[in-house]
Design a protein with these regions (language model features):
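Alpha-helical DNA-contacting segments of helix-turn-helix folds
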Residues: 16, 51-59, 101, 105, ...
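Short hydrophobic clusters on alpha-helical segments that form packing/core surfaces
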Residues: 8-16, 59, 63, 87, ...
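Hydrophobic alpha-helical connector segments
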Residues: 68-96, 134, 141-144
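N-terminal intrinsically disordered/low-complexity leader segments
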Residues: 1-3, 185-186
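Amphipathic C-terminal alpha-helical segment
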Residues: 100, 146-163, 178-186
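Helix-turn-helix
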Residues: 7, 11, 15-50, 54
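Amphipathic alpha-helical packing segments from all-alpha helical-bundle domains
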Residues: 106-143, 164-182
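Amphipathic alpha-helical linker/stalk segments
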Residues: 55-82, 120-129
Length: 186
């Protein structure tokens, strides 16, 4: 097996999704890859801190690819619904990776800012069709991000206990947000 950064990050993502992000460390990754942990320092001389950063970047890149695919050929509400459902599915399939993606400061470096820029840009692009002002688009993106990150984070930690189906709640919240966006232009 050829050992490179991508292979190591993908192994870390698998471990995070199966065991949880707290279980990701160089020893566990080395065991998963069938190597000795000092071999990982060749690729990550910053150790686990550097690996965590790469894991965050990897997760945001994957999410951007998924929501881009979901939005293609759709407009307005249909595009936003597709993006939101894809985001939610991504989180449920990649709970550990999603957790790694949350602990970043997007203004820490240009690289961090670029990591989230694509997903945000897609939302801004879709919102163009609503004829919103720049300020209204910023507010709309913030509301959508807050809803998605909050709802999906709580759901991924099994934080909802009510017997009403979560799909119904997710769709209700999304419909409420979409109605609010549409009402901006009435």
């Amino acid at each position: 097996m050829s050992l490179d950064k991508k292979t190591i990050v993908e192994a870390a993502a698998r471990i995070a999704d199966i065991e949880g992000i707290s279980k990701v460390n160089l020893t566990v990754i080395a065991k998963e890859l069938g190597i000795k942990s000092p071999s990982l320092y060749k690729h990550f001389n910053g150790g686990i801190e550097e690996l965590n950063k790469e894991l965050m970047l990897y997760g945001w890149h994957l999410l951007e690819c998924e929501i881009t695919k979901a939005a293609i050929g759709k407009a307005k509400d249909d595009a936003i619904i597709a993006i939101c459902n894809t985001y939610r599915s991504f989180v449920l399939q990649h709970k550990g990776l999603f957790e790694a993606m949350q602990w970043y400061n997007m203004y820490q470096s240009k690289e961090h800012l670029e990591a989230t820029k694509g997903t945000v840009a897609i939302l801004f692009q879709v919102l163009e069709a609503y004829g919103l002002t720049e300020e209204e688009k910023v507010h709309s993106v913030r509301v959508l991000r807050g809803f998605l990150q909050g709802f999906c984070s709580i759901e991924s930690h099994n934080g909802y206990g009510n017997p009403i189906p979560l799909d119904d709640t997710f769709n209700f919240a999304l419909k409420t947000i979409l109605n609010g966006i549409s009402d901006l232009k009435k």
